[in-house]
C-alpha cells in the first residue's frame, strides 16, 4: 500500500458515511494525484461543508496544506487553527511540544506513527497545530504519520461507540437504528437508480420504504415492527442491480 493510499484510508475512516464522504474521497484522490492545485479554493470548500466536526475539518485542512503546493506567504486558516489547538488545554500543548521534538528526529512515516500512537488525541491535534502554524517543521512523511495516528485514535473511539449502539439491548434504540438504516438505504437506492429507464421500480421501492418509516415515526409503532426492514430493502436493491448487470454483494 502506498503512503498516500494509507493516508487516504485513515482520513476517510473518520468521515461519516454519505454523499459528502464520496465527495471528500474524490477531492483527496485529486489532491494526491496533483490534479487540484488551488489550495485557497479547496480550503474555502472544506470550511463550508456541513456535518463534519471541527476536528475532522482541521485534519483535512492540514492534509490539503501539506499536499497542495502553495505560495509561501499564503494565510493560515482560522477554522483549522481553532480545531488543532487541543481544546486550549495547556497539558495538551506541553505533550504536543514533547511529541514534536521526537517527530523532528524521525524521518519515516511508520516510525512517526508508532511514536504518535502513545499520545492522546488532544496532544496529537495540538502537535498538528504547531506544524500547521509553522512553529515547527517535520518531514512530510512524519506529518502524515502523525495524521494517521490521530485518525486511528478517533476511529477507535467511534468504533467503540458504534459497537455499543449495535449491541444495545434497548429495543427503542434498536428500533430507531433500524429505521434510520432503512431510510439511508432508501436514499442510496434513489441516488443509484439515476435516470435509467429501469430505475422507476427501484425509485418506487425506495419511496415506499421512506414513506413507511415516516408513518412509523409519526404514529409510533411497536419496537419489533421495524425488524427486517433494512434487509428487505437491500434484497430489493440487489435484485435491481442484478437486472442492471451490477454486482455489489458487499452491501450488507
From Swiss-Prot:
A motif (Nuclear localization signal) lies at residues 101-105. Coiled coil: none annotated. It comes from the Viruses. Keywords: Host nucleus, Membrane, RNA-binding, Viral matrix protein, Virion. It is a peripheral membrane protein. Its main location: virion. It is found in: Virion membrane; Host nucleus. InterPro entries: Flu_matrix_M1, Flu_matrix_M1_C, Flu_matrix_M1_N, Flu_matrix_M1_N_sub1, Flu_matrix_M1_N_sub2, INFV_M1. Residues 1-164 are annotated as: Membrane-binding. One of its GO terms (molecular function) is RNA binding. Residues 165-252 are annotated as: RNP-binding. It holds the Pfam family Flu_M1_C. GO terms for cellular component: host cell nucleus; membrane; virion membrane. GO terms for biological process: viral budding from plasma membrane. The keyword Ribonucleoprotein does not apply. Most abundant protein in virion. When expressed alone can form virus-like particles in transfected cells. Plays critical roles in virus replication, from virus entry and uncoating to assembly and budding of the virus particle. M1 binding to ribonucleocapsids (RNPs) in nucleus seems to inhibit viral transcription. Interaction of viral NEP with M1-RNP is thought to promote nuclear export of the complex, which is targeted to the virion assembly site at the apical plasma membrane in polarized epithelial cells. Interactions with NA and HA may bring M1, a non-raft-associated protein, into lipid rafts. Forms a continuous shell on the inner side of the lipid bilayer in virion, where it binds the RNP. Determines the virion's shape: spherical or filamentous. Clinical isolates of influenza are characterized by the presence of significant proportion of filamentous virions, whereas after multiple passage on eggs or cell culture, virions have only spherical morphology. Filamentous virions are thought to be important to infect neighboring cells, and spherical virions more suited to spread through aerosol between hosts organisms. Homodimer and homomultimer. Interacts with NEP. Binds ribonucleocapsid by both interacting with genomic RNA and NP protein. May interact with HA and NA. Cannot bind NP without genomic RNA. Belongs to the influenza viruses Matrix protein M1 family. This is Matrix protein 1.
Amino acid at each position: 500500500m502506498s503512503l498516500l493510499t494509507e493516508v487516504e484510508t485513515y482520513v476517510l475512516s473518520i468521515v461519516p458515511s454519505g454523499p459528502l464522504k464520496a465527495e471528500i474521497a474524490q477531492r483527496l484522490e485529486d489532491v494526491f494525484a496533483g490534479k487540484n492545485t488551488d489550495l485557497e479554493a479547496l480550503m474555502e470548500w472544506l470550511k463550508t461543508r456541513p456535518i463534519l466536526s471541527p476536528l475532522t475539518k482541521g485534519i483535512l485542512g492540514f492534509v490539503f496544506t501539506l499536499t497542495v503546493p502553495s505560495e509561501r506567504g499564503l494565510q493560515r486558516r482560522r477554522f483549522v487553527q481553532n480545531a488543532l489547538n487541543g481544546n486550549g488545554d495547556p497539558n495538551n500543548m506541553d505533550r504536543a511540544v514533547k511529541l514534536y521534538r521526537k517527530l523532528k528526529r524521525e524521518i519515516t512515516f511508520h516510525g512517526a506513527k508508532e511514536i504518535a500512537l502513545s499520545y492522546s488525541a488532544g496532544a496529537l491535534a495540538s502537535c498538528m497545530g504547531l506544524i500547521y502554524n509553522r512553529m515547527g517543521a517535520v518531514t512530510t512523511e512524519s506529518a502524515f504519520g502523525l495524521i494517521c495516528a490521530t485518525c486511528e485514535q478517533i476511529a477507535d473511539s467511534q468504533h467503540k461507540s458504534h459497537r455499543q449502539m449495535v449491541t444495545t439491548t434497548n429495543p427503542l434504540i434498536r428500533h430507531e437504528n433500524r429505521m434510520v438504516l432503512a431510510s439511508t438505504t432508501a436514499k442510496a437506492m434513489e441516488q443509484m437508480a439515476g435516470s435509467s429507464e429501469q430505475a422507476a421500480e427501484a425509485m418506487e421501492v425506495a419511496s415506499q420504504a421512506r414513506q413507511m418509516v415516516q408513518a412509523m415515526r409519526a404514529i409510533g409503532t411497536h419496537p419489533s415492527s421495524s425488524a427486517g426492514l433494512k434487509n428487505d430493502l437491500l434484497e430489493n436493491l440487489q435484485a435491481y442491480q442484478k437486472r442492471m448487470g451490477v454486482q455489489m454483494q458487499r452491501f450488507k
